[in-house]
């Protein structure tokens, strides 16, 4: 690996330099020693970087210019819905009445904020076909876990605590079995059929008296709609299990079909995907959970309800699993999502899904002559191609993904789902123009030609990025996580 990266802020530090200074305080202060127990007081001076203001500004401006995001390039990261985030969302989120409020304020002082929470709950109920919605979970996987804990409490409350198995398709998100494990369940895999859908015969084989639930994404991670969903519902419900909907792919079906109408008992949504909350960099996210009326009494508390012409917190939820997030979740994301939903309206959301599906099928059709497409039918919002043809020339999907970086395109998701060899999962979203799609398609076709005629160019990519090929094995086995370790390495 070679690096053209900037120095760390700590490496720019010079003793005695400072960015700004404050006047001496005329307020009486107390020493740290008088306020804290000895065990909380540092023995050595904290090693904060000492830099001038100009150096500080240049450092972070330089780093920001090296970042890649939806605002400066195409980001077809499959199963992540990297759509453009409208800037009006940011303006609304910065309205002082919202941005300067505090979750510990009295209800009477934050009626506007509570109304936003309540109204967003109502909008999401309509979109999903669920009877009740909580906004508390902070991310998709957190929403998965919350729903599974509701399922667990429901089964235990009905004298069926022995139900400890959750069925997960072999094409599922990795978070599904992980969330099941965190919730105390065992994961049982159900295989896909030749069309990429749940194998009904295999489902009948694995379902039993210990089945607590099945976790499904529809359309699934291959971008294929599970057309047998009503039969799946009947099989699982007849066995006493529940149906969980992973909302990662809701962008494909808004105002077309609702999870509740398909027979799902609970659903989580990703406000940071489908509803344009910004994501990447670790957060913040938001993973609301909706449930049918039979599960409503198990939702986390508090809920926000409307009482006459006022809004208030409701802690009187009989079988509640308790809080799953301090206060009431990531409120700033609610504002962005609510703004998006109200801006688009039902017709606009329907057009979003139509455009997302059209874009994915356009790319798939144009690439089908140059790459292996394991599932030939029309896809929904995303699809998976395979790099097995290019592998014949010694070039793998990883190499092609690295080469895309040289063309200013973020690589799609690779090697996922696991049941596609040399897989590359592409999700263009609805916000990209035909010109952008054509550029991406032409770029991938040119890389496929390079793989055949000049494989070394692909194998040595990327050529233009700040960081070249990472030594991923060493990075995983011997990570440098602290600055002092970096100094030792040097």
Curated annotation (Swiss-Prot):
**A biological process (GO) annotation for this entry?**
glycine decarboxylation via glycine cleavage system
Query: Which Enzyme Commission number(s) are listed?
Result: 1.4.4.2
Q: Which coenzymes or cofactors are required?
A: pyridoxal 5'-phosphate
Entry-linked InterPro entries:
Aminotrans_V_dom (IPR000192), GcvPB (IPR023012), GDC-P_C (IPR049316), GDC_P (IPR020581), PyrdxlP-dep_Trfase (IPR015424), PyrdxlP-dep_Trfase_major (IPR015421), PyrdxlP-dep_Trfase_small (IPR015422)
Residues modified to N6-(pyridoxal phosphate)lysine = 273
Q: Which GO terms describe its cellular component?
A: cytosol; glycine cleavage complex
Q: Which Gene3D superfamilies does its entry note?
A: 6.20.440.10, Aspartate Aminotransferase, domain 1 (3.90.1150.10), Type I PLP-dependent aspartate aminotransferase-like (Major domain) (3.40.640.10)
Q: One matching Pfam family, short form?
A: GcvP2_C
Q: Which CDD domains match?
A: GDC-P
- Do you know which SUPFAM superfamilies this protein is assigned to? PLP-dependent transferases
Enzymatic class: oxidoreductase
User: Per the record's keyword annotation, is Nucleotidyltransferase included, yes or no?
Assistant: no
Keyword annotations of the record: Oxidoreductase, Pyridoxal phosphate
Q: Which reaction does it catalyse?
A: N(6)-[(R)-lipoyl]-L-lysyl-[glycine-cleavage complex H protein] + glycine + H(+) = N(6)-[(R)-S(8)-aminomethyldihydrolipoyl]-L-lysyl-[glycine-cleavage complex H protein] + CO2
Subunit structure, interactors included: The glycine cleavage system is composed of four proteins: P, T, L and H. In this organism, the P 'protein' is a heterodimer of two subunits.
Family, as annotated: Belongs to the GcvP family. C-terminal subunit subfamily.
What name appears for this protein in its UniProt entry? Probable glycine dehydrogenase (decarboxylating) subunit 2
Species assigned in the record: Staphylococcus aureus (strain Newman)
């Amino acid at each position: 690996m070679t690096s053209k990266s900037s120095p760390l802020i700590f490496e720019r530090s010079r003793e005695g330099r400072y960015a700004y200074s404050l006047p001496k305080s005329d307020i009486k202060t107390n020493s740290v020693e008088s306020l804290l127990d000895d065990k909380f007081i540092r023995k050595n001076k904290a090693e904060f970087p000492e830099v001038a203001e100009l150096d500080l500004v240049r450092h972070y401006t330089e780093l920001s210019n090296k970042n890649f995001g939806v605002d400066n390039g195409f980001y077809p990261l499959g199963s992540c819905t990297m759509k453009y985030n409208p800037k009006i969302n940011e303006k609304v989120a910065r309205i002082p009445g919202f941005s300067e409020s505090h979750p510990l304020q009295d209800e009477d002082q934050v009626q506007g904020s509570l109304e936003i929470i309540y109204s967003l709950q109502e909008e999401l109920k309509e979109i999903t076909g669920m009877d009740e919605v909580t906004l508390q979970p902070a991310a998709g996987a957190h929403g998965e876990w919350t729903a599974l804990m509701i399922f667990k409490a429901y089964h235990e409350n009905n004298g069926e605590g022995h139900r400890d198995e959750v069925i997960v398709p072999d094409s599922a998100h990795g978070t599904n079995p992980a969330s099941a494990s965190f919730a105390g369940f065992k994961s049982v895999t159900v295989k896909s059929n030749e069309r990429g859908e749940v194998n009904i015969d295999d489902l009948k084989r694995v379902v039993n008296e210990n089945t607590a639930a099945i976790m499904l994404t529809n359309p699934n991670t291959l971008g294929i709609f599970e057309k047998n969903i009503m039969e799946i519902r009947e099989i699982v419900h007849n066995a006493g299990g529940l149906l969980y909907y992973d909302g990662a792919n809701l962008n494909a079906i808004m105002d077309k079909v609702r999870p509740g109408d398909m027979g799902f008992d609970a659903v989580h949504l990703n406000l940071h995907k489908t509803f344009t909350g910004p994501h990447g960099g670790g957060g913040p996210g938001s993973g609301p959970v909706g449930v049918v009326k039979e599960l409503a009494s198990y939702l986390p508390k508090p809920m926000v309800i409307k009482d006459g012409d006022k809004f208030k917190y409701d802690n009187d939820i009989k079988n509640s699993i308790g809080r799953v997030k301090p206060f009431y979740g990531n409120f700033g994301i609610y504002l962005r999502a609510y703004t998006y939903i109200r801006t688009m309206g039902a017709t606009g959301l329907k057009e979003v899904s139509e455009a997302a599906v059209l874009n994915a099928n356009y790319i798939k059709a144009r690439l089908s002559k140059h790459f292996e497409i394991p599932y030939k039918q029309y896809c929904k919002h995303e699809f998976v191609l395979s790099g097995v043809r290019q592998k014949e020339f010694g070039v793998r999907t990883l190499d092609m993904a690295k080469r895309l970086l040289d063309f200013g395109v973020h690589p799609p998701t690779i090697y996922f789902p696991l049941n596609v060899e040399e897989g590359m999962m592409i999700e263009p979203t609805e916000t990209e123009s035909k010109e952008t799609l054509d550029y991406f398609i032409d770029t991938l076709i040119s890389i496929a030609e390079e793989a055949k005629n000049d494989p070394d160019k692909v194998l040595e990519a990327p050529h233009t990025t700040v960081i070249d090929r990472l030594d991923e094995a060493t990075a995983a086995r011997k990570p440098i996580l602290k600055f002092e370790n970096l100094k030792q390495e040097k």
